[in-house]
Amino acid sequence: MKSLSLLALAAIAPPAAVAAVVDRQVPFENRPVQGLPEKFLIQLGPEQTRWVTEDEKWALKMEGVNFFDITAEPDRGFSAKSHERIQVSFPSEVKHQTELAPLLEQLSKDNMRQNLVHFTSFHTRYYKSETGVQSATWLFEQVEEAIQDSGAAQHAVKVERFEHSWGQFSIIATIPGRTNKTVVIGAHQDSINLFLPSILPAPGADDDGSGTVTILEAFRVLLQSEAVQQGNAANTIEFHWYSAEEAGLLGSQAIFSDYSKTGRDIKAMLQQDMTGYVEGTTKAGEVESVGVITDFVDPGLTEFIKRVITGYCTIPFVLTQCGYACSDHASASRYGYPSAFVIESEFKRSNQRIHTTGDTVDLLSFDHMLQHARMTLAFAYELAFAEL
């Protein structure tokens, strides 16, 4: 997710080990000259783009600079303003406390811990690595297992791979509703060690193993609702696990670009990226809370998220900002879809060990992750039955 500020990258970073795929639609004159480092077009703000090498991408992330990599986007020159923003009215109150009460009791910290320990055992989940494919395959199997164990497969609940030109695929699980109006919950499955991405370990426990297993647990429990799994909800629910977030939101961009082109009716998207670290907050003497992002998000959906947290979590929220293109919700916003993002704490108190070998499970709070799981489950259920 966010970038970690570290020093002296230039002195230690080697040339990139693997060249990224160049989109076939890039004009010949814009392709890199043979023998020179491959260049990528990144977008650092609504109207700001730049050509960089892969090593320069990682240097920017180390300096705390986030971006879209739009090299492979056919309409890469478009401004975010060119996609008309979808206007959605979200509920003014939460209404399903009775139905959600028994479901919330089924959320399991042990499940999240067990899944996260295994997920972080892969050497790296770097999007162009062999172990990145292996970790995605394992995650896909866990989603499949949740569907089979709940009996939801007989009601057309399904999980699919969304393939990319790099190795690691994204994952989309769909719970059909009575309409094609769709609510998306997302997290990114890849990890990165910014010092040597293709070589060094990248456990990525918090970034974003925590979000990955948080929404997996919410998905598992949501399928215990007969009304949901049998398709009686008003709206379709999708759970996404994105590839290649760390490389410039590549996986989520590809998905929401496809949704835009095919006319998908996406009513809301919630991102869960980094859900487990509280040490920064508690050491500062502050109250444990979740961080509601307020910049580059949909205001109406963000107000609804506040209602969900107040209604279903046992800790408060704080308002905070993370900047442009700081996680995959930005891809939904880029294509006009309402998006929101909730992180583990106020942004300045979030985990500073990400993108290194130090992003490990032992530093995380599963009690805190349970709060994010409660919020995610309640968000999905409330909007599944809402008139949007």
From Swiss-Prot:
Q: Which UniProt keywords apply?
A: Aminopeptidase, Disulfide bond, Glycoprotein, Hydrolase, Metal-binding, Protease, Secreted, Signal, Zinc, Zymogen
> Where does the secretion signal sit in this chain?
1-19
Residues with an annotated glycan are N180
What are its cofactors? Zn(2+)
The entry's Zn(2+) 2-binding residues are D207, E246, H355
GO terms for CC?
A: extracellular region
Q: How is the cofactor bound?
A: Binds 2 Zn(2+) ions per subunit.
Described function: Extracellular aminopeptidase that allows assimilation of proteinaceous substrates.
Identify this protein by name.
Answer: Leucine aminopeptidase 1
State the species of origin: Coccidioides posadasii (strain C735)
Please name the gene that encodes this protein: LAP1
